[in-house]
Amino acid sequence: MSEQDITSQPAQDENQIMAERRQKLTEIRTSKGIAFPNDFRRQHLAAPLHAQYDATDKEALEAQPVEVVVAGRMMLKRVMGKASFATVQDSSGRIQFYISRDKVGEDVYADFKTWDMGDILGAKGTLMKTKTGELSVEVSELRLLSKSLRPLPDKFHGLADQEQKYRQRYVDLIINQDSRDTFIKRSKIVQTVREVMVGEDYLEVETPMMHPIPGGAAAKPFVTHHNALDMPLYLRIAPELYLKRLVVGGLERVFEINRNFRNEGMSTRHNPEFTMIEFYEAYCGYERMMEMTEKIIRRCAEAACGTTKVTYNGKEVDLGKPFDRFTIVGAIKHYNPQYTDEQLADEAWLKSEIKALGGKLPPAPGIGSLQLALFEECAEGKLWNPTFIIDYPVEVSPLARGSDADPSITERFELFIVGREHANGYSELNDPEDQAARFRSQVEQKDAGDDEAMHYDADYIRAMEYGLPPTGGCGIGIDRLVMLLTDAPSIRDVILFPHMRPE
């Protein structure tokens, strides 16, 4: 008996293996004519067959034969004289084939013995139980549907293989069930977000991906050029200003799930191309947006994990209880009780402390931006359970409505979980004159060297001048939410094809 599987193939030169497989393909073309047939129609998947028949005993399957038509990739092969076994994997799982020379015929059996792991097979047969009780397909017809020319790796481990996992996601998905599960969960999460929004009477819309003026967030854009119009365009950094134009137009509850692009660094938390949901609702403020954010995240946890208590990096995260709330100064003092109110109101002390902690001074002037910079150094990473940080300074919130009680702050929040930002929302600024003044301030910051400051968007001001109702808005990062709910250490683990440096 000989046995092969993808975790125990002997080391062999890949070029030699591929040459041998190409020779086999040439022989198939010569003898069969059609090497990649497309007339086989699968009717059954592995997982439903196991679910329905694993508990059925051998005698019952023999008494009432169950005919099946299955197909998938061969992941294991055991050749034993006149009979062999093959384990085949489809999108739902794996099932074993029992292949006997007497059933499939001498020619097909001889062909099967030359086939390789990774080849895609189609089979017709009846269900059976082996001596060990494993549900299998006793094959009566067997076909090679697609020849695999490149051998599958044994497994992924270590840094080099982690890189390969991201670069060749198609291989990762073949051999790594955890990766397949992650992306199935991702799909469930996106579907759940959409269900929540539709259930709240929001309208799903699509807004431009290429903008004549970048806006809606503080970030560096990717720049491209429209040849016919001979003008620069920017891949969108956020859909915010277009979505709020729709609220002006009378679409009072809108949302969009789509990509944003930011021409910035890559890390375990950042990919230049990422997915967000942004949603806007007229006649509400940031309290309603926080309520919606909690609802979305809880529902996604229930859909993906079956519970609102999840584990991340070995530590529990409770998404079921009401999310905590702190102001920026409140969070700093909560996690750093040694700081005094006098220190936190002293611009010189704040600058000194930020530098002492290894942080960078913010480009935006003002005590509020310094407090935010200190928060990022000494408190943000400690926000493990869901926490809303509220009332951001006006100088770093150019699109948020100012507080009636304190004009130095805005009705803005960010949500932090496991020390990472997951959402950003606010009561929208709907005073066009105030918005124009803030845009001018952003332009001054850009002229002073702040690459992430916003441009002046005259058309958005024109839209606001028609009247933007009191509105709340929020954006939630889908990739980071998937990271949280799949216990993924890197954003690359939850994006099918993350950006990588050239090989």
UniProtKB/Swiss-Prot annotation:
Record's keyword terms, sorted: Aminoacyl-tRNA synthetase, ATP-binding, Cytoplasm, Ligase, Magnesium, Metal-binding, Nucleotide-binding, Protein biosynthesis
EC number(s) recorded for this UniProt protein: 6.1.1.6
Cofactor: Mg(2+)
Reaction equations catalysed: tRNA(Lys) + L-lysine + ATP = L-lysyl-tRNA(Lys) + AMP + diphosphate
Pfam families to which the protein is assigned, alphabetical: tRNA-synt_2, tRNA_anti-codon
UniProt-listed GO biological process terms: lysyl-tRNA aminoacylation
Cofactor remark: Binds 3 Mg(2+) ions per subunit.
InterPro entries (alphabetical): Aa-tRNA-synt_II, aa-tRNA-synth_II, aa-tRNA-synth_II/BPL/LPL, Lys-tRNA-ligase_II, Lys-tRNA-ligase_II_N, Lys-tRNA-synth_II_C, NA-bd_OB-fold, NA-bd_OB_tRNA
Compartment(s) where it occurs, according to its Swiss-Prot or TrEMBL record: Cytoplasm
Residues reported in the UniProt entry to bind Mg(2+) 1: 414, 421
Superkingdom of the organism of origin: Bacteria
Gene3D superfamilies, per database record: Bira Bifunctional Protein, Domain 2 (3.30.930.10), Nucleic acid-binding proteins (2.40.50.140)
Similarity annotation: Belongs to the class-II aminoacyl-tRNA synthetase family.
Protein known as: Lysine--tRNA ligase
Lineage: Bacteria, Pseudomonadati, Pseudomonadota, Betaproteobacteria, Neisseriales
